[in-house]
UniProtKB/Swiss-Prot annotation:
Region (Interaction with ARC): 218-254
Protein's recorded name: Endophilin-A2
Residues bearing PTM Phosphotyrosine: 315
Tissue: Ubiquitous. Higher expression in pancreas, placenta, prostate, testis and uterus.
Renumbered residue ranges of the record's region Disordered: 244-308
Organism listed in the record: Homo sapiens (Human)
Keywords in alphabetical order: Cell junction, Cell projection, Chromosomal rearrangement, Coiled coil, Cytoplasm, Endocytosis, Endosome, Lipid-binding, Membrane, Phosphoprotein, Proto-oncogene, SH3 domain
Length: 368
């Protein structure tokens, strides 16, 4: 920084201290300017909070949001173009229904109904994904651009104006001790900054119809989503009602138990006391199995050497997104990296991926 720049910083700091501590009066801005500044500040707060709440509305699960952010960051680091999307709750419900519907089989009314409902839930998830994309392009991105460009630029002009005001007030207080030309230049710069800040705030407030247009795009996207969702659910409801009608029209199958096979107790034998008795069944002794023997559980996967970083799975973990590593309770996983305080990266049976720290117990920690 030049000597002139250092002097200017000193002037501003000195004037600020005299106002904050000494109670000195600074140059007052007009009421119209203050009113515009207040409206811009309220607009900035409104846009920031509406953005955050909109993202929560589209992606309500905070854990999934954090996980998605982490995976997207890792994808960027690895140069992967395709990023995993937010796991919609409708899609997860649909996958669950389809899985159990297939297990129950085609002869089960409930199984067939679960398959119908599962397919509809997956369609709802696809429609929700379309809503996410539409809202991001036409509402979230424009508002973020407003925050990062227009509002940020206004804050820059206001900060510059405040600095030039402090410089002007300091020199005005020392009038007679500094050249008049220096005081005149300070006043011109202050008025110039005030005009620039005023113009930028005026332009923002006068073009707020753009934000109305973006809000309208959000509502249109929601309407389109709900229309499609209603259509999908109407179709599903009709399918289920048809299944109920078909099931009620079919004759009920009566349960017929199988005939019992006769059980032969054999001829009774007389004991010395004259009472009948039956011979107790003999238990064959075997060297390969005794009652005290217990089945030995063998690990389902190969274990890494214990001299390298590793951990043991405490619970089963089913991967939900690309890049995650699935495992079963008791598996020993080789640790390769710690992504953050909640996620590890590791290898198991030649496959690499990410998994939550809370699902494992560290056996050999990663080197610091």
């Amino acid at each position: 920084m030049s000597v002139a720049g250092l002097k200017k910083q000193f002037y501003k700091a000195s004037q600020l201290v005299s106002e904050k501590v000494g109670g000195a009066e600074g140059t007052k801005l007009d009421d119209d300017f203050k009113e515009m500044e207040k409206k811009v500040d309220v607009t900035s707060k409104a846009v920031t909070e509406v953005l955050a709440r909109t993202i929560e509305y589209l992606q309500p699960n905070p854990a999934s949001r954090a996980k998605l952010t982490m995976l997207n960051t890792v994808s960027k680091i690895r140069g992967q173009v395709k990023n995993p999307g937010y796991p919609q709750s409708e899609g997860l419900l649909g996958e669950c229904m389809i899985r159990h519907g297939k297990e129950l089989g085609g002869e089960s009314n409930f199984g067939d109904a679960l398959l119908d409902a599962g397919e509809s839930m997956k369609r709802l998830a696809e429609v929700k994904d379309s809503l996410d994309i539409e809202v991001k392009q036409n509402f979230i991105d424009p508002l973020q651009n407003l925050c990062e460009k227009d509002l940020k630029e206004i804050q820059h002009h206001l900060k510059k104006l405040e600095g030039r005001r402090l410089d002007f007030d300091y020199k005005k207080k020392r009038q007679g001790k500094i050249p008049d030309e220096e005081l005149r230049q300070a006043l011109e710069k202050f008025e110039e900054s005030k005009e620039v800040a005023e113009t930028s705030m005026h332009n923002l407030l006068e073009t707020d119809i753009e934000q109305v247009s973006q809000l309208s795009a959000l509502v249109d996207a929601q309407l389109d989503y709900h229309r499609q969702a209603v259509q999908i659910l109407d179709e599903l409801a009709e399918k289920l009602k048809r299944r109920m009608r078909e099931a009620s029209s079919r004759p009920k199958r009566e349960y017929k138990p199988k005939p019992r096979e006769p059980f032969d107790l054999g001829e009774p034998e007389q004991s010395n006391g004259g009472f009948p008795c039956t011979t107790a069944p003999k238990i064959a002794a075997s060297s390969s199995f005794r009652s005290s023997d217990k089945p030995i559980r063998t690990p389902s996967r190969s274990m890494p050497p214990l001299d390298q970083p590793s951990c043991k799975a405490l619970y089963d973990f089913e991967p939900e997104n690309d890049g995650e590593l699935g495992f079963h309770e008791g598996d020993v996983i080789t640790l390769t990296n710690q992504i953050d305080e909640n996620w590890y990266e590791g290898m198991l049976d030649g496959q690499s991926g990410f998994f939550p720290l809370s699902y494992v117990e560290v056996l050999v920690p990663l080197p610091q």
